Curated annotation (Swiss-Prot):
Its main location: membrane. It is a multi-pass membrane protein. It holds the Pfam family DUF986. This is UPF0266 membrane protein YobD. The keyword Secreted does not apply.
Amino acid sequence: MTITDLVLILFIAALLAYALYDQFIMPRRNGPTLLSIALLHRGRVDSVIFVGLVAILIYNNVTSHGAQMTTWLLSALALMGFYIFWIRTPRIIFKQRGFFFANVWIEYNRIKEMNLSEDGVLVMQLEQRRLLIRVRNIDDLEKIYKLLIENQ
């Protein structure tokens, strides 16, 4: 096994750990889930570039008669990238004391201001950061509003 294979195994393990955390562990942290809303995907171009570069590496490895283990590891990396960027849906998960957005826990008392833009983007102003929440279904904004009113 080469150093390249070890690095690929590390990247695959990191992506797998992230996918498992995002799908199974995060919804169970910080109490029961009150509301889970699907968000729009961001960075589709980045994902196409990533999977395309891995496909080029697979092609290069196959045409130069590289190790089969490396080809399989690159294929697994491409599949993990495809899952994370294209199949998995990003979510905002509301709990009793706060919410998870982009895998970061944010407590409700950190919200200083909330606005709704004309194109349906919920803007939450925190102390030093602004969150742009783009929901997949525009009707979910009303659910978020009701939940925040009940919990404040």
